[in-house]
Amino acid sequence: MKLVIASDIHGAADACARLMSAIEAESPDRVVLLGDLLYHGPRNDLPKDYAPKRVIEMLNSIADRVIAVRGNCEAEVDQMVLKFPCMADHNVLLDSGAEGGPYTLFLTHGHVYGPGYHNSVDSWPALPPRSALVYGHTHIKVSEKDAEHGAWVFNPGSAGIPKDGSASYGVYESGRFEHRML
């Protein structure tokens, strides 16, 4: 199973267009969106390319491949305009074909469940062996094993408002995660 994983677009249309090009080039089975898709929120500056209607159009064009979770900036109106479910706090994917056996991905934004890194909440869900906690929210890329919990921790960074210098997304394939720049 191949996934493109993105988070924190925040209505940035040019960034979303670059992400759409990356999705086309990667040709994933599914696209995972970890929240904060349309609104920039009260703590972030307005992205220079802020155009949520364009972002809606782009994301709706791939609705049949999207698995999304709610970020702290999502509102019920977002669900009214997006053609895929986006209001759950988490989702769980099982990659039964992963190298070495089944692999569980716990998908969340980082404000309800998270590893406690940067400004994510420190609230770990119960995870089986061979798991990853995949989250967004911080706008900072992370890919490392958490020694205390024994799970892989992955944050794709932010597509729209990066706080670590570069817009990015992630790719998951057969139990491995990678960051890619936009």
Protein language model regions, located:
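Short, well-ordered coil/turn elements that cap or connect secondary structure elements
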Residues: 61-63, 88, 100-102, 128, ...
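Short C-terminal domain-edge/linker segments immediately following a structured domain
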Residues: 34-38, 63-64, 97-104, 136-142, ...
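Beta-strand-turn-beta hairpins that frame and shape the catalytic cleft
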Residues: 1-3, 93-106, 146-153, 174-178
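Active-site neighborhood of phospho(di)ester-bond hydrolases with catalytic His/Asp-centered motifs
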Residues: 5-7, 31-36, 66-72, 106-109, ...
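Core catalytic region of metal-dependent phosphoesterases/phosphodiesterases
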Residues: 2-96
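Conserved beta-sheet core of the metallophosphoesterase superfamily
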Residues: 84, 111-182
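Active-site-proximal segments of metal-dependent phosphoesterases and phosphodiesterases across multiple
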Residues: 42-52, 81-127, 160-165
